[in-house]
From Swiss-Prot:
Domain of life: Bacteria
Gene coding for it: ftsA
Name of the protein described by the UniProt record: Cell division protein FtsA
GO biological process, one term: FtsZ-dependent cytokinesis
Keywords: Cell cycle, Cell division, Cell membrane, Membrane
Stated family: Belongs to the FtsA/MreB family.
Bilayer topology annotation: Peripheral membrane protein
InterPro entries: ATPase_NBD (IPR043129), Cell_div_FtsA (IPR020823), FtsA/MreB (IPR050696), FtsA_C (IPR021873), SHS2_FtsA (IPR003494)
Subunit structure comment from the entry: Self-interacts. Interacts with FtsZ.
Length: 457
């Protein structure tokens, strides 16, 4: 059951920082304030400059406060899946009260018993998701409080991450003047918010196409099956445009947003002017030519994702592929993705008034996830916070939950390094361009032989 109140989500991205304030009332989430500020001090989704990132966060929070008309004291901040480890665990305690009635304290204690795992000093528990409680052998219990029993067991999934990344995240947010209410694993929030009940049950994949990285999350049977990070995103498309057309990064971003088409068959032959470095006059370029540059990078990203999904037999899930994120807004993105994946692909657009934009799907999911946390979830989080204040102690670890043994959590979810690739200058689309502007500098001549193949490694 959803909690009522105000929930603030904080999405710290490579290109922008988004803050969203939502009020949950009568089971409905209503957005009352949202902001989008330029990001600083963040690279590939990871904070690399605490002061710069804190300044950007503070600016975004101030904007959101002004629009929402409230003072923001704490936030629910998203954590990317970089170097995430997930593993099943279980705990068991005796119920020691005289009445044998299970209380909040018993729930906290059984969670703590599940956390008694030997962990290296460089890792920290992010969250613990209880899957079921068992009271005196009776399974499938969601909330055991108020029940009577002599033995309480619990099974769930334990999520851990690099201590340094978590420390930097909390310190940055606190330096911006607010407290961290919850650290929420972004892939978990995304699949819960973006997908419907049927998609989460039968299986679907969400692809968040950001500026600095692309995040993949697959869910099936209501459980997160796979997460993957590619250190390539919309910024790499902009870099390719800048390099091939020999124009500034700022102008290249404008060309992408104003004339970009991800699927070349849909691109027009219309021309536009480009200021080229080293040229006195602007050069005419066709939208079709620009589309070839854009699609080459995006296709490269999607093909890497397809390989990962194919390896794990997760490509042909009934729910297909769902695209979100700022880079997913490009026209033709769905068509290109369908061509690459060969399955149903759709673009998710939030239905909240005023922010019907896939770029806000992530920050919305953070507020929604926080609002959906049950009292049992909050008790588990409280137990984790208490344990994280203590030094990790090498204590024997309980039995593993077998039903999720095939999940990739047994190994770290490593971010795939961005390959050193070079953009290719398209040649075929230039034929029409040359006919339309015979007196203009010939881009095909300038770039012919620049690079043989965009993705030769």
């Amino acid at each position: 059951m959803a909690r009522e109140g105000f929930f603030t989500g904080l999405d710290i991205g490579t290109s922008s920082v988004k803050v969203l304030v939502a009020e949950q009332r009568n089971g409905e989430l209503n957005v009352i304030g949202v902001s989008n500020a330029k990001s600083k001090g963040v690279k590939d989704g990871i904070i690399v400059d605490i002061d710069a990132a804190a300044t950007a966060i503070k600016s975004a929070i101030s904007q959101a406060e002004e629009k929402a008309g409230i003072s923001i004291k704490s936030v629910n901040v998203g954590l990317p899946g970089n170097l995430l480890q997930v593993e099943p665990t279980q705990g068991m305690i005796p119920v020691t009260s005289d009445t044998k009635e299970i209380t909040d304290q018993d729930v906290e204690n059984v969670v703590k018993s599940a956390l008694t795992k030997s962990m290296t000093p460089d890792r920290e528990v992010i969250t613990f998701i209880p899957e079921e409680f068992i009271v005196d052998g009776f399974q499938g219990i969601r909330d055991p409080r108020g029940m009577m029993g002599v033995r309480l067991e619990m099974r769930g999934l334990l999520y851990t991450g690099p201590r340094t990344i978590l420390h930097n995240l909390r310190k940055t947010v606190e330096r911006a003047g607010v407290q961290v209410e919850n650290v929420i694993i972004s892939p978990l929030a995304m699949v819960q918010s973006v997908l419907n009940e049927g998609e989460r049950e039968f299986g679907a994949t969400v692809i968040d196409m950001g500026a600095g990285q692309t995040t993949v999350a697959t869910i099936r049977n209501q459980e997160l099956q796979f997460t993957h990070i590619l250190q390539e995103g919309g910024d790499y498309v902009t870099k390719d445009i800048s390099k091939v057309l020999k124009t500034s990064r700022k102008l290249a971003e404008g060309l992408k947003l104003n004339y970009g088409e991800a699927y070349p068959p849909l691109a027009s032959k219309e021309t536009f002017q480009v200021e080229v470095i080293g040229e006195v006059e602007a050069v005419e370029v066709t939208e079709a030519y620009l589309s070839e540059i854009i699609s080459a990078r995006i296709k490269h990203i999607l093909e890497q994702i397809k390989q990962e999904l194919d390896r794990r037999r997760l490509l042909d899930l009934p729910g297909g592929i769902v695209l979100i994120g700022g880079n997913a807004i490009l026209p033709g993105m769905v068509e290109l993705a369908q061509e690459v994946f060969g399955v149903r692909v759709k673009l998710y657009v939030p239905n909240q008034v005023g922010i019907r934009n896939p770029a806000f799907a992530h920050v919305i999911s953070l507020s929604e996830f926080a609002g959906q946390l049950t009292e049992v979830n909050l008790l588990a989080q409280g137990a984790i916070k208490g344990e994280n204040d203590l030094s990790h102690q090498p204590i024997s670890f309980g039995g593993m939950l077998q039903k999720t043994a095939q999940f990739v959590q047994s190994t770290p979810v490593q971010p795939a390094p961005a390959p050193e690739v070079e953009p290719v200058a398209p040649t075929e689309p230039m034929a029409d361009f040359q006919q339309a502007s015979q007196n203009k500098p010939k881009l095909a001549d300038r770039f012919r032989g620049l690079i043989g193949s965009m993705f030769d490694e």
